[in-house]
Amino acid sequence: FAHRRATVKRVLDDLEREGAEFVVGLTHQEIGEDEALAREFGDRIDWIVGGHEHVAQFLRVGATTITKADADAKTAYRIDVRPTAGGERPAFTATAALVELDKSVELDSDMVRHVATSLVRLATAIEGKTGRKLLDVVATTEHLLEGTEPTIRGRETALGDLLCDILRDRFDLDLAFVNGGAIRVNDDVPAGGNLRVYELEGIFYYDDKPVIFELTGREILGLLEKSVSQATLGHGRFLQVAGLRFSYEVAPDGKTRVDAADVTVRPAGGTEFAPLELDRRYRAATLDYTWRNGYRDRDW
């Protein structure tokens, strides 16, 4: 935040010299970082329109209002700002209303054309790379595959199990894990539904690659504790796993804890789950983002 603080201060100084009367901060960062921004510059920023989280939020920090709408064009905040008379510095009243973007809302023609063009480009790229068309059916589901962010980032899901099982089985490993933030589909595939190339491409938007490595049982325990440390907030660090089972506790103060006694592992080739051995080395796989950086820049 130190680097951002200097940048924000410079921009605010410029805006005030140019005569700005109502300042809106357009951000894409976690809510805690927006709150820190409001606390630091609250007398100079009237409103923060934020992103990053994918669920609607509304809060006030001092004199600053922070709003975030739902992702995937489900909602939008309409913010009305009106000047009021009097005072040395121009004053304003500002209100916000969360609007559901349902079928009653007219589509923007420019955006419709943009989406159509993007889908054609995507379909062409997929067919050139895989030989499959975007709407080709790959499989039919027997069970519900939950891919919405509140589930994939907060608890075990069949979709997460499937993805990690594929990764683990493909390389004959002890375990595999994928962070919920890497699973981008944000939708469910119903039981008895068709799983198309479109859905498969929507699961992983990033160009992630699998990484195989070894880690100790003690390191596994540490990963699991970090995985659930913000599970109640729907953070992308929550891990979907294969080859191991675990449970965690949430204390009254919101802090989470994973006990080693609540972790079991089914090593490659095994049929039974056994207690986690803290000093044993296990072979595992994950995606290269988690391997290279994970969430170190976010207290990972």
Regions found by a protein language model. Name each.
Residues 1, 148-155, 208-211:
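Second-shell loop/turn segments in exported
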Residues 1-106, 154-166, 176, 229-231:
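Acidic, metal/ion-coordinating pockets
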Residues 3-10, 22, 32, 110, ...:
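Generic recognition of stable, solvent-exposed alpha-helical segments in well-folded globular domains
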Residues 9, 49, 82, 107-112, ...:
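Residue-level recognition of well-ordered secondary-structure positions
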Residues 19-22, 38-41, 51-54, 147-150, ...:
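N-terminal start-of-chain detector that recognizes signal peptides
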Residues 63, 144-151, 204-207:
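Flexible glycine/proline-enriched surface loops and loop-helix/loop-strand junctions
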Residues 83-192, 253-255, 292-294:
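A short C-terminal boundary segment appended to hydrolase-like catalytic domains
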Residues 91, 161-300:
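Feature captures C-terminal
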